[in-house]
């Protein structure tokens, strides 16, 4: 097996480990590192053909195999087995951009982790035309640290998130609320399959809670036609459960006063002021 893998043109190095089991089949772990800057075609060929050959050579039902490579300054890891691995790997190579630090292709998702920066790059959100979003069978996620705040994007096939003003929302967060803040945009949330924006901030005490940060974020997305829900979370370090204020949206307009309304109404009123997101 080592000889076969090492003989492939695109392969730089191979490591094979066998873990004997007393009453079960032996467990095989295979790490394959490709030569730098491989083409999409060569990656797809190794991922598809090499895994099938390794299964044949070991006689095992399953082999844990990791194919890794570096493209520019981006490290990519493909974990096998997975369905349509060659298509996923090929599409990922096409989607790579210089700002990406680490990319992982796994059984159910492709995750793109970006280098820390002070401002969100323009056109950060992957468009529906991206090869990875046309796959359909895998979740596609993007994550980046913007200064002291985290930003996550979770995609779904057929959902275009590019119109959601995530960059503007991040920039409107008051400086004293940016440390540890999280802004998450989901094409489909787990329960209701709605396009949802979640903003989470930290306060030292519930007494420090104010509507300014929440209103600023909400104001940036008023009028957006894609979002169906906005959730604003506030956490105190000593408390396990954050406080949540939710807003359902339809055609860019908030429906009702928020949930709970006694918390939502003042946030919505502040968000609707002309200078709320500036």
Outline where the language-model segments fall.
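Short secondary-structure junctions
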Residues: 6-14, 58-59, 96-98, 174-180, ...
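Short edge beta-strands and adjacent turn/loop segments
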Residues: 8-32, 103-111, 176-199
């Amino acid at each position: 097996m080592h000889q076969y893998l090492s003989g492939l043109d695109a392969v730089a190095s191979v490591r094979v480990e066998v873990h004997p089991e007393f009453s079960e089949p032996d467990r095989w772990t295979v790490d394959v590192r490709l030569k730098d800057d491989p083409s999409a075609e060569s990656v797809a060929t190794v991922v598809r053909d090499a895994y099938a050959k390794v299964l044949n050579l070991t006689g095992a039902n399953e082999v844990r195999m990791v194919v890794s490579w570096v493209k520019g300054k981006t490290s990519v890891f493909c974990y096998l087995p997975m369905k349509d691995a060659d298509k996923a790997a090929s599409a990922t190579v096409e989607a790579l951009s210089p700002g990406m630090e680490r990319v992982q292709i796994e059984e159910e998702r492709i995750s793109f982790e970006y280098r820390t920066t002070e401002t969100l790059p323009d056109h950060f959100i992957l468009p529906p035309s991206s090869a990875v979003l046309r796959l359909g069978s895998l979740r596609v996620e993007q994550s980046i640290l913007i200064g002291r705040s985290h930003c996550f994007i979770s995609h779904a096939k057929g959902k275009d998130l590019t119109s959601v003003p995530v960059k503007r929302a991040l920039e409107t967060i008051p400086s004293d609320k940016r440390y540890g803040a999280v802004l998450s945009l989901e094409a489909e949330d787990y329960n209701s399959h709605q396009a949802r924006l979640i903003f989470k901030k930290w306060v030292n005490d519930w007494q420090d809670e104010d509507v300014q940060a929440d209103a600023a974020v909400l104001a940036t997305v008023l009028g957006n036609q894609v979002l169906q829900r906005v959730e604003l979370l506030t956490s105190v370090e000593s408390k396990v459960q954050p406080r949540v204020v939710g807003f359902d949206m339809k055609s860019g307009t908030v429906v009702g006063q928020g949930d709970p309304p006694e918390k939502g109404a003042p946030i919505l009123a502040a968000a609707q002021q002309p200078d709320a997101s500036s």
